[in-house]
Amino acid sequence: MDLALFFRNEVKPALGCTEPGAVAYAASIAARHCPGEPLSVALSLSLSMFKNGRDVGIPGTGGLRGNRLAAVLGVLAGDADKGLMALEHIDMAVVERAQTLLDAGMVTEEVVDGVPGVYAAVTLRCAGHEVTVTVAGRHDRVASIVVDGEVVGGEGMERAPEADGTLHGGASCEPSASFTEPPLPAYLEELRECDFAQLWDMAAGIDATLEQELLRGAAMNMAVARMGLESGWGLGVGHTLAAHAEAADLHARIRFMAGAAADVRMAGAPQPVMSSAGSGNHGITATVPVAVAAEGLGVSPRVQAEALALSHLVTGYLKAHTGRLTPICGCSVAAGAGAAAGIVKVLGGNAVQAERAVASLMASLMGMLCDGAKGSCGLKVATAAGEAYAAALLGMDDRGVQRPEGVVNPDIATTARALARLSREGFAAADAVMVELLGGGKH
Protein backbone atom coordinates (compact mmCIF):
# COMPACT_ATOMS: atom_id res chain seq x y z
CA MET A 1 0.00 0.00 0.00
CA ASP A 2 1.15 3.54 -0.76
CA LEU A 3 1.60 4.89 2.77
CA ALA A 4 2.32 8.43 1.60
CA LEU A 5 -0.98 8.48 -0.30
CA PHE A 6 -2.87 7.13 2.71
CA PHE A 7 -1.50 9.75 5.08
CA ARG A 8 -1.85 12.59 2.57
CA ASN A 9 -5.56 11.85 2.13
CA GLU A 10 -6.56 10.52 5.55
CA VAL A 11 -4.48 12.60 7.98
CA LYS A 12 -4.65 16.33 7.30
CA PRO A 13 -5.53 19.61 9.05
CA ALA A 14 -9.17 20.61 9.46
CA LEU A 15 -10.66 23.79 10.92
CA GLY A 16 -13.74 23.19 13.03
CA CYS A 17 -16.08 20.24 12.66
CA THR A 18 -15.75 18.57 9.26
CA GLU A 19 -19.51 18.35 8.57
CA PRO A 20 -20.27 22.10 8.61
CA GLY A 21 -16.83 22.52 7.03
CA ALA A 22 -17.99 20.40 4.09
CA VAL A 23 -21.22 22.41 3.85
CA ALA A 24 -19.27 25.68 3.84
CA TYR A 25 -16.91 24.30 1.20
CA ALA A 26 -19.80 23.33 -1.09
CA ALA A 27 -21.48 26.70 -0.51
CA SER A 28 -18.31 28.60 -1.35
CA ILE A 29 -18.03 26.71 -4.65
CA ALA A 30 -21.67 27.48 -5.40
CA ALA A 31 -21.05 31.19 -4.80
CA ARG A 32 -18.33 31.19 -7.46
CA HIS A 33 -20.88 30.10 -10.04
CA CYS A 34 -23.76 32.33 -8.92
CA PRO A 35 -23.05 36.05 -9.39
CA GLY A 36 -25.04 38.68 -7.58
CA GLU A 37 -26.78 38.80 -4.23
CA PRO A 38 -27.87 35.45 -2.82
CA LEU A 39 -31.64 35.00 -2.69
CA SER A 40 -31.89 31.61 -0.99
CA VAL A 41 -29.84 28.61 0.10
CA ALA A 42 -31.30 25.11 0.42
CA LEU A 43 -29.42 22.27 2.12
CA SER A 44 -30.16 18.60 1.47
CA LEU A 45 -28.17 16.47 3.92
CA SER A 46 -27.70 12.86 4.89
CA LEU A 47 -28.82 11.83 8.37
CA SER A 48 -25.24 11.84 9.59
CA MET A 49 -24.34 15.22 8.09
CA PHE A 50 -27.45 16.74 9.65
CA LYS A 51 -26.82 15.48 13.17
CA ASN A 52 -23.08 16.13 13.12
CA GLY A 53 -23.48 19.74 12.02
CA ARG A 54 -26.56 20.71 13.99
CA ASP A 55 -25.09 21.74 17.34
CA VAL A 56 -21.37 22.20 16.78
CA GLY A 57 -19.61 25.56 17.01
CA ILE A 58 -18.36 27.30 13.85
CA PRO A 59 -14.83 28.75 14.21
CA GLY A 60 -14.60 32.52 14.18
CA THR A 61 -18.29 33.13 14.97
CA GLY A 62 -18.17 33.68 18.70
CA GLY A 63 -19.82 30.36 19.48
CA LEU A 64 -22.59 30.30 16.85
CA ARG A 65 -23.53 26.88 15.52
CA GLY A 66 -24.97 24.78 12.76
CA ASN A 67 -24.96 23.75 9.11
CA ARG A 68 -27.23 26.57 8.01
CA LEU A 69 -24.85 29.19 9.39
CA ALA A 70 -21.91 27.39 7.77
CA ALA A 71 -23.71 27.46 4.42
CA VAL A 72 -24.49 31.17 4.41
CA LEU A 73 -20.97 32.01 5.63
CA GLY A 74 -19.59 29.90 2.79
CA VAL A 75 -21.74 31.81 0.31
CA LEU A 76 -20.78 35.23 1.67
CA ALA A 77 -17.09 34.81 2.39
CA GLY A 78 -15.91 31.22 1.95
CA ASP A 79 -12.66 30.49 0.15
CA ALA A 80 -13.24 27.38 -1.95
CA ASP A 81 -9.51 27.00 -2.56
CA LYS A 82 -9.06 26.15 1.12
CA GLY A 83 -11.37 23.14 1.04
CA LEU A 84 -12.55 22.18 4.53
CA MET A 85 -10.88 25.33 5.88
CA ALA A 86 -13.02 27.57 3.63
CA LEU A 87 -14.09 29.71 6.61
CA GLU A 88 -10.58 30.29 7.93
CA HIS A 89 -10.60 34.07 7.41
CA ILE A 90 -14.18 35.15 8.13
CA ASP A 91 -14.71 38.14 10.41
CA MET A 92 -17.52 39.24 12.72
CA ALA A 93 -18.94 41.68 10.15
CA VAL A 94 -19.60 38.72 7.85
CA VAL A 95 -20.99 36.71 10.76
CA GLU A 96 -23.46 39.50 11.58
CA ARG A 97 -24.61 39.70 7.97
CA ALA A 98 -24.99 35.93 7.85
CA GLN A 99 -27.09 35.96 11.00
CA THR A 100 -29.35 38.62 9.48
CA LEU A 101 -29.93 36.44 6.41
CA LEU A 102 -30.62 33.41 8.61
CA ASP A 103 -33.13 35.38 10.66
CA ALA A 104 -34.85 36.39 7.41
CA GLY A 105 -35.42 32.72 6.56
CA MET A 106 -33.01 32.62 3.64
CA VAL A 107 -31.64 29.13 4.44
CA THR A 108 -33.60 25.87 4.58
CA GLU A 109 -32.33 22.45 5.63
CA GLU A 110 -33.73 18.97 5.07
CA VAL A 111 -32.63 15.38 5.62
CA VAL A 112 -32.80 13.10 2.56
CA ASP A 113 -32.71 9.32 2.25
CA GLY A 114 -30.93 7.10 -0.25
CA VAL A 115 -27.62 8.96 -0.14
CA PRO A 116 -24.14 8.15 1.23
CA GLY A 117 -23.35 8.89 4.87
CA VAL A 118 -21.23 11.84 3.80
CA TYR A 119 -23.61 13.83 1.59
CA ALA A 120 -24.45 17.52 1.39
CA ALA A 121 -26.13 19.24 -1.56
CA VAL A 122 -26.12 23.05 -1.37
CA THR A 123 -28.48 24.83 -3.77
CA LEU A 124 -27.88 28.57 -4.12
CA ARG A 125 -30.26 30.86 -5.97
CA CYS A 126 -29.30 34.34 -7.10
CA ALA A 127 -30.82 36.63 -9.74
CA GLY A 128 -31.57 34.45 -12.76
CA HIS A 129 -29.37 31.53 -11.72
CA GLU A 130 -29.45 28.37 -9.62
CA VAL A 131 -26.38 26.37 -8.63
CA THR A 132 -26.25 23.04 -6.79
CA VAL A 133 -22.95 21.74 -5.45
CA THR A 134 -22.85 18.27 -3.93
CA VAL A 135 -20.12 16.77 -1.77
CA ALA A 136 -20.39 13.02 -1.22
CA GLY A 137 -18.36 10.04 -0.11
CA ARG A 138 -15.69 12.18 1.54
CA HIS A 139 -16.07 15.60 3.11
CA ASP A 140 -13.85 17.25 0.51
CA ARG A 141 -15.02 15.21 -2.51
CA VAL A 142 -17.05 17.37 -4.90
CA ALA A 143 -19.39 14.93 -6.63
CA SER A 144 -21.18 17.44 -8.85
CA ILE A 145 -21.47 21.12 -9.74
CA VAL A 146 -24.72 21.89 -11.55
CA VAL A 147 -25.30 25.40 -12.96
CA ASP A 148 -28.78 26.19 -14.28
CA GLY A 149 -29.43 22.50 -14.86
CA GLU A 150 -26.13 21.74 -16.59
CA VAL A 151 -23.41 19.63 -14.99
CA VAL A 152 -20.19 21.65 -15.20
CA GLY A 153 -17.92 19.77 -12.80
CA GLY A 154 -17.46 17.17 -10.09
CA GLU A 155 -16.22 13.61 -9.81
CA GLY A 156 -19.66 12.04 -10.30
CA MET A 157 -21.87 9.86 -8.15
CA GLU A 158 -22.69 6.16 -8.14
CA ARG A 159 -26.44 5.78 -8.66
CA ALA A 160 -28.36 3.12 -6.77
CA PRO A 161 -29.58 0.22 -8.94
CA GLU A 162 -32.81 0.66 -10.87
CA ALA A 163 -35.63 -1.85 -10.50
CA ASP A 164 -34.12 -3.97 -13.28
CA GLY A 165 -30.76 -4.05 -11.50
CA THR A 166 -28.96 -1.69 -13.88
CA LEU A 167 -26.61 0.96 -12.56
CA HIS A 168 -26.25 4.49 -13.85
CA GLY A 169 -23.33 6.69 -12.90
CA GLY A 170 -22.70 10.38 -13.28
CA ALA A 171 -23.73 13.58 -11.59
CA SER A 172 -27.30 14.62 -10.95
CA CYS A 173 -28.90 17.96 -10.22
CA GLU A 174 -31.51 16.24 -8.07
CA PRO A 175 -30.41 16.45 -4.41
CA SER A 176 -32.85 13.70 -3.43
CA ALA A 177 -31.82 11.23 -6.14
CA SER A 178 -30.89 7.79 -4.81
CA PHE A 179 -27.17 7.11 -4.72
CA THR A 180 -24.88 4.48 -3.28
CA GLU A 181 -21.63 5.03 -1.45
CA PRO A 182 -18.86 5.80 -3.95
CA PRO A 183 -16.22 3.07 -4.18
CA LEU A 184 -13.37 3.25 -1.72
CA PRO A 185 -10.08 4.64 -3.01
CA ALA A 186 -7.69 1.86 -4.00
CA TYR A 187 -5.43 2.48 -1.01
CA LEU A 188 -8.34 1.94 1.41
CA GLU A 189 -9.40 -1.21 -0.44
CA GLU A 190 -5.84 -2.46 0.06
CA LEU A 191 -5.93 -1.46 3.71
CA ARG A 192 -9.17 -3.39 4.28
CA GLU A 193 -7.46 -6.58 3.16
CA CYS A 194 -4.55 -6.29 5.60
CA ASP A 195 -4.20 -8.32 8.75
CA PHE A 196 -3.01 -6.72 11.96
CA ALA A 197 0.58 -7.88 11.56
CA GLN A 198 0.72 -6.03 8.25
CA LEU A 199 -0.59 -2.83 9.85
CA TRP A 200 2.08 -3.18 12.54
CA ASP A 201 4.83 -3.65 9.95
CA MET A 202 3.64 -0.71 7.85
CA ALA A 203 3.79 1.57 10.88
CA ALA A 204 7.32 0.40 11.61
CA GLY A 205 8.35 1.14 8.03
CA ILE A 206 7.43 4.83 7.75
CA ASP A 207 10.11 7.01 6.18
CA ALA A 208 11.67 10.14 7.67
CA THR A 209 9.24 12.47 5.90
CA LEU A 210 6.18 10.69 7.26
CA GLU A 211 7.79 10.55 10.69
CA GLN A 212 8.07 14.34 10.77
CA GLU A 213 4.53 14.84 9.46
CA LEU A 214 3.10 12.52 12.10
CA LEU A 215 4.96 14.30 14.87
CA ARG A 216 3.78 17.65 13.49
CA GLY A 217 0.18 16.46 13.59
CA ALA A 218 0.53 15.27 17.17
CA ALA A 219 2.06 18.61 18.18
CA MET A 220 -0.85 20.44 16.52
CA ASN A 221 -3.42 18.44 18.48
CA MET A 222 -1.49 18.67 21.75
CA ALA A 223 -1.47 22.47 21.36
CA VAL A 224 -5.26 22.39 21.06
CA ALA A 225 -5.45 20.18 24.16
CA ARG A 226 -3.40 22.68 26.15
CA MET A 227 -5.77 25.44 25.04
CA GLY A 228 -8.61 23.44 26.53
CA LEU A 229 -6.80 23.02 29.83
CA GLU A 230 -6.03 26.70 30.16
CA SER A 231 -9.43 28.21 29.51
CA GLY A 232 -12.11 25.56 29.90
CA TRP A 233 -13.68 25.68 26.43
CA GLY A 234 -17.09 24.13 25.78
CA LEU A 235 -18.25 21.76 28.49
CA GLY A 236 -14.85 22.05 30.15
CA VAL A 237 -14.40 18.28 30.31
CA GLY A 238 -10.61 18.32 30.13
CA HIS A 239 -10.24 21.44 32.25
CA THR A 240 -12.38 19.99 35.06
CA LEU A 241 -10.83 16.51 35.00
CA ALA A 242 -7.36 18.05 35.10
CA ALA A 243 -8.24 20.14 38.14
CA HIS A 244 -9.07 16.98 40.09
CA ALA A 245 -6.27 14.70 38.85
CA GLU A 246 -2.83 13.91 40.17
CA ALA A 247 -0.22 15.35 37.80
CA ALA A 248 1.74 12.08 37.78
CA ASP A 249 -1.30 9.93 36.88
CA LEU A 250 -0.73 9.05 33.22
CA HIS A 251 -4.15 7.45 32.84
CA ALA A 252 -5.87 10.60 34.06
CA ARG A 253 -3.65 12.84 31.94
CA ILE A 254 -4.49 10.88 28.79
CA ARG A 255 -8.19 11.34 29.56
CA PHE A 256 -8.17 15.04 30.35
CA MET A 257 -5.82 16.05 27.54
CA ALA A 258 -7.95 14.29 24.91
CA GLY A 259 -11.15 15.69 26.41
CA ALA A 260 -9.67 19.19 26.48
CA ALA A 261 -8.78 19.05 22.79
CA ALA A 262 -12.31 17.96 21.89
CA ASP A 263 -13.73 20.73 24.11
CA VAL A 264 -11.84 23.32 22.08
CA ARG A 265 -12.84 21.88 18.73
CA MET A 266 -16.53 21.42 19.54
CA ALA A 267 -16.75 24.96 20.91
CA GLY A 268 -15.67 26.31 17.51
CA ALA A 269 -12.24 27.68 18.37
CA PRO A 270 -10.39 29.05 15.32
CA GLN A 271 -7.64 26.47 15.71
CA PRO A 272 -7.05 23.64 13.20
CA VAL A 273 -6.53 20.06 14.32
CA MET A 274 -4.92 17.15 12.50
CA SER A 275 -7.79 14.91 11.41
CA SER A 276 -7.92 11.17 10.83
CA ALA A 277 -10.34 9.38 8.48
CA GLY A 278 -12.02 12.68 7.67
CA SER A 279 -12.74 13.72 11.27
CA GLY A 280 -11.02 16.11 13.62
CA ASN A 281 -12.30 14.31 16.71
CA HIS A 282 -11.03 11.03 15.27
CA GLY A 283 -7.70 12.78 14.82
CA ILE A 284 -7.69 13.96 18.42
CA THR A 285 -8.57 10.52 19.77
CA ALA A 286 -6.03 8.79 17.54
CA THR A 287 -3.15 11.14 18.39
CA VAL A 288 -3.46 12.79 21.80
CA PRO A 289 -3.51 9.61 23.96
CA VAL A 290 -0.48 8.28 22.07
CA ALA A 291 1.37 11.59 22.32
CA VAL A 292 0.63 11.96 26.04
CA ALA A 293 1.81 8.39 26.70
CA ALA A 294 4.96 8.97 24.64
CA GLU A 295 5.69 12.22 26.48
CA GLY A 296 5.03 10.68 29.89
CA LEU A 297 7.18 7.63 29.25
CA GLY A 298 9.99 9.50 27.52
CA VAL A 299 10.19 7.40 24.37
CA SER A 300 12.10 8.53 21.30
CA PRO A 301 10.45 10.62 18.55
CA ARG A 302 10.83 7.65 16.22
CA VAL A 303 8.88 5.33 18.52
CA GLN A 304 6.21 7.99 18.96
CA ALA A 305 5.91 8.45 15.18
CA GLU A 306 5.56 4.70 14.60
CA ALA A 307 2.90 4.55 17.33
CA LEU A 308 1.02 7.45 15.72
CA ALA A 309 1.25 5.77 12.32
CA LEU A 310 -0.18 2.56 13.77
CA SER A 311 -3.00 4.48 15.44
CA HIS A 312 -3.99 6.20 12.18
CA LEU A 313 -3.72 2.95 10.22
CA VAL A 314 -5.97 1.06 12.64
CA THR A 315 -8.44 3.95 12.64
CA GLY A 316 -8.44 4.02 8.84
CA TYR A 317 -8.76 0.24 8.65
CA LEU A 318 -11.89 0.21 10.80
CA LYS A 319 -13.43 3.22 9.03
CA ALA A 320 -12.78 1.56 5.67
CA HIS A 321 -15.12 -1.19 6.88
CA THR A 322 -17.81 0.97 8.50
CA GLY A 323 -17.85 4.06 6.27
CA ARG A 324 -17.04 7.69 7.10
CA LEU A 325 -20.13 8.58 9.15
CA THR A 326 -21.94 5.98 11.22
CA PRO A 327 -24.60 5.62 13.95
CA ILE A 328 -21.83 4.25 16.19
CA CYS A 329 -19.36 6.77 17.63
CA GLY A 330 -16.30 6.32 15.45
CA CYS A 331 -14.20 8.56 17.68
CA SER A 332 -14.65 6.06 20.48
CA VAL A 333 -14.60 2.77 18.61
CA ALA A 334 -12.35 3.29 15.58
CA ALA A 335 -9.99 6.02 16.76
CA GLY A 336 -10.08 4.67 20.31
CA ALA A 337 -8.96 1.30 18.95
CA GLY A 338 -6.20 3.03 17.02
CA ALA A 339 -5.03 4.79 20.17
CA ALA A 340 -5.02 1.51 22.11
CA ALA A 341 -2.75 -0.07 19.51
CA GLY A 342 -0.51 2.98 19.41
CA ILE A 343 -0.10 3.04 23.18
CA VAL A 344 0.96 -0.62 23.14
CA LYS A 345 3.70 0.40 20.69
CA VAL A 346 4.76 3.19 23.08
CA LEU A 347 4.82 0.71 25.96
CA GLY A 348 7.18 -1.57 24.03
CA GLY A 349 4.65 -4.26 23.17
CA ASN A 350 4.25 -6.42 20.09
CA ALA A 351 1.65 -6.86 17.36
CA VAL A 352 -0.21 -9.64 19.19
CA GLN A 353 -0.56 -7.50 22.31
CA ALA A 354 -1.68 -4.50 20.27
CA GLU A 355 -4.36 -6.50 18.45
CA ARG A 356 -5.66 -7.76 21.80
CA ALA A 357 -5.78 -4.18 23.04
CA VAL A 358 -7.87 -3.23 20.00
CA ALA A 359 -10.31 -6.05 20.78
CA SER A 360 -10.56 -5.04 24.45
CA LEU A 361 -11.24 -1.41 23.53
CA MET A 362 -13.98 -2.44 21.13
CA ALA A 363 -15.53 -4.79 23.68
CA SER A 364 -15.78 -1.82 26.03
CA LEU A 365 -17.12 0.86 23.68
CA MET A 366 -18.62 -0.75 20.56
CA GLY A 367 -22.20 0.21 21.47
CA MET A 368 -21.56 3.93 22.00
CA LEU A 369 -23.99 5.92 19.84
CA CYS A 370 -23.17 8.97 17.77
CA ASP A 371 -25.89 11.54 18.43
CA GLY A 372 -24.11 14.30 16.54
CA ALA A 373 -21.12 16.57 16.96
CA LYS A 374 -21.52 18.89 19.96
CA GLY A 375 -19.94 19.91 23.24
CA SER A 376 -20.60 16.59 24.96
CA CYS A 377 -18.32 14.85 22.46
CA GLY A 378 -15.57 15.88 24.87
CA LEU A 379 -16.99 13.35 27.32
CA LYS A 380 -16.91 10.57 24.72
CA VAL A 381 -13.40 11.43 23.55
CA ALA A 382 -12.13 11.50 27.14
CA THR A 383 -13.78 8.14 27.80
CA ALA A 384 -12.29 6.61 24.66
CA ALA A 385 -8.83 7.92 25.52
CA GLY A 386 -8.99 6.48 29.02
CA GLU A 387 -10.29 3.14 27.77
CA ALA A 388 -7.54 3.04 25.14
CA TYR A 389 -4.91 3.24 27.86
CA ALA A 390 -6.69 0.60 29.96
CA ALA A 391 -6.97 -1.70 26.93
CA ALA A 392 -3.27 -1.20 26.19
CA LEU A 393 -2.35 -2.18 29.74
CA LEU A 394 -4.48 -5.32 29.44
CA GLY A 395 -2.74 -6.14 26.18
CA MET A 396 0.69 -5.64 27.69
CA ASP A 397 -0.19 -8.06 30.48
CA ASP A 398 -1.46 -10.59 27.91
CA ARG A 399 -4.96 -10.12 29.31
CA GLY A 400 -8.19 -8.75 27.90
CA VAL A 401 -10.11 -10.23 24.98
CA GLN A 402 -8.32 -13.42 23.88
CA ARG A 403 -11.28 -15.43 22.55
CA PRO A 404 -14.67 -14.45 21.08
CA GLU A 405 -16.60 -12.32 23.57
CA GLY A 406 -20.07 -11.51 22.26
CA VAL A 407 -19.63 -9.92 18.83
CA VAL A 408 -15.98 -9.04 19.52
CA ASN A 409 -13.21 -11.33 18.32
CA PRO A 410 -9.46 -11.08 19.02
CA ASP A 411 -8.96 -11.04 15.24
CA ILE A 412 -9.36 -7.45 14.01
CA ALA A 413 -10.76 -8.47 10.62
CA THR A 414 -13.58 -10.50 12.15
CA THR A 415 -14.48 -7.72 14.56
CA ALA A 416 -14.30 -5.07 11.83
CA ARG A 417 -16.84 -6.99 9.77
CA ALA A 418 -19.12 -7.33 12.79
CA LEU A 419 -18.78 -3.62 13.55
CA ALA A 420 -19.64 -2.72 9.95
CA ARG A 421 -22.76 -4.87 9.94
CA LEU A 422 -23.93 -3.60 13.32
CA SER A 423 -23.42 -0.02 12.21
CA ARG A 424 -25.07 -0.31 8.80
CA GLU A 425 -27.88 -2.72 9.64
CA GLY A 426 -28.32 -2.97 13.39
CA PHE A 427 -28.08 0.72 14.24
CA ALA A 428 -29.73 2.18 11.12
CA ALA A 429 -33.09 2.56 12.86
CA ALA A 430 -31.40 4.18 15.85
CA ASP A 431 -29.86 6.80 13.54
CA ALA A 432 -33.26 7.64 12.05
CA VAL A 433 -34.87 7.92 15.49
CA MET A 434 -32.07 10.18 16.72
CA VAL A 435 -32.54 12.53 13.79
CA GLU A 436 -36.29 12.68 14.48
CA LEU A 437 -35.54 13.56 18.10
CA LEU A 438 -33.18 16.27 16.86
CA GLY A 439 -35.87 17.75 14.61
CA GLY A 440 -34.54 16.55 11.27
CA GLY A 441 -37.51 17.59 9.14
CA LYS A 442 -37.30 20.37 6.58
CA HIS A 443 -37.00 23.82 8.13
From Swiss-Prot:
Top-level taxonomic group? Bacteria
Q: Segment Disordered: which positions? A: 156-178
What is one GO biological process annotated to this record? Answer: L-cysteine catabolic process to pyruvate
Membrane-spanning segments: none
Molecular-function GO term, any one: L-cysteine desulfhydrase activity
InterPro entries the record matches? Ser_deHydtase-like_asu, UPF0597
* Family the UniProt entry places it in: Belongs to the UPF0597 family.
Q: What is this protein called?
A: UPF0597 protein Dvul_2496
What is the source species?
Nitratidesulfovibrio vulgaris (strain DP4) (Desulfovibrio vulgaris)
